[in-house]
Design a protein with these regions (language model features):
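A solvent-exposed, acidic/Ser-Thr-rich amphipathic alpha-helical stretch
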Residues: 26-93
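Intrinsic disorder/low-complexity signal
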Residues: 5-7, 21, 39, 82, ...
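Short linear sequence elements within intrinsically disordered, low-complexity coil regions
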Residues: 22-23, 38, 60, 117, ...
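A beta-strand edge to alpha-helix "cap/lid" segment located at domain peripheries
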Residues: 63-141
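Charge-dense, low-complexity intrinsically disordered segments
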Residues: 4, 46-49, 103
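Short, low-complexity N-terminal intrinsically disordered segments enriched in polar/charged residues
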Residues: 1-35
């Protein structure tokens, strides 16, 4: 069975996810996902997207020019077997849209529900589902 080292690697993976999303390092962000990752944001007024090649252009179109700050807290990681794990992360994010957009600001709270797979390149996110508990919006005048 897996070790504390695996948990540490998954924590590092998620930390990279948050940092790379906020710094808009899209090609490096690609590397945190499996090629066939499933992204489900339907509970956040979003959609389901299959594959990193579909997800990244969608993500860039949504937040490419938005200043973002994502934080993950209190991970609950379960090692299923040597090469698979599941996780739930409490999350908080803040987003600031550029001038001229209908939304100015969002402060959100919720959870990431994820699965992970160990690959030859280390642990990767194989599925991600975002759920929201609360959102505070500020709209443009």
């Amino acid at each position: 069975m897996s070790t504390q080292s695996d948990l540490d690697q998954i924590h590092q993976l998620k930390a990279r996810y948050f940092r790379l999303m906020d710094t808009k390092e899209w090609e490096l962000l690609r590397d945190v996902f499996t090629v066939d990752v499933r992204i489900d944001t339907t509970e956040d007024s979003g959609t389901v997207i299959d594959g990193v090649d579909e997800y990244l252009p969608f993500l860039i179109s949504q937040i490419g020019d938005v200043v973002t700050a994502h934080h993950g807290h209190m991970p609950e990681i379960s090692l299923v077997d040597d090469d698979h794990a599941t996780g739930i992360w409490a999350m908080e994010d803040e987003l600031w849209w550029p001038e001229g957009q209908p939304i100015k600001y969002l402060h959100g709270y919720g959870h990431y529900h994820e699965t992970y797979v160990r690959t030859a390149d280390g642990w990767k996110i194989s599925s991600l589902r975002l759920t929201r508990l609360h959102r505070i919006f500020e709209f443009a005048d």
